[in-house]
């Protein structure tokens, strides 16, 4: 049975912790393939995201060298709000016999009951909860994980405390982002003047 990981996110920008998590997921979950899915019109984001073509290009640059990783643009091409369940349904239709692993951070996993058709998400994929470095209460079980034990597993995430929010702030302040984003991504951001305040 094919094992496919699904890792969604804004990737605004993608950074070294994203890549480390992808590598950890491929190894620990023994995945045949991992689909990196940049978020489309995210219903839960309060911040305006960078334009889709930029986020797609940065994701392609960030994950280009990783084997078995495919950057999947389907959510960016979707019209209207982008829901994870729709993406999983599409994947299930493409690979009906595959086993799917949805990779989420702890904060996302705890918010899962607020997601569109979240019960179906639990049927379509195993939820792999990545514990962030230095997170408060890291590793503590939450209600849904306790009540749906068979649909959850923990994914040990490398201890890299890097955030896209910090990276955007550093670009805006013209500070170094060395060791936070890959050089091709940093060059792309600089070339397109992303994250610059007016």
Curated annotation (Swiss-Prot):
Group of enzyme by EC: transferase
Gene3D superfamilies: HUPs
Catalytic activity: nicotinate beta-D-ribonucleotide + ATP + H(+) = deamido-NAD(+) + diphosphate
A GO term, aspect molecular function: nicotinate-nucleotide adenylyltransferase activity
Entry's Gene Ontology BP terms: NAD biosynthetic process
Superkingdom of this protein's organism: Bacteria
InterPro entries: Cyt_trans-like, NadD/NMNAT, Rossmann-like_a/b/a_fold
Keywords per UniProt: ATP-binding, NAD, Nucleotide-binding, Nucleotidyltransferase, Pyridine nucleotide biosynthesis, Transferase
Key word Nucleotidyltransferase present: yes
Keyword Methyltransferase among UniProt keywords: no
NCBIfam families (alphabetical): nicotinate (nicotinamide) nucleotide adenylyltransferase, PRK00071.1-3
Function recorded in the entry: Catalyzes the reversible adenylation of nicotinate mononucleotide (NaMN) to nicotinic acid adenine dinucleotide (NaAD).
Family: Belongs to the NadD family.
Protein name per Swiss-Prot or TrEMBL: Probable nicotinate-nucleotide adenylyltransferase
Gene encoding the protein: nadD
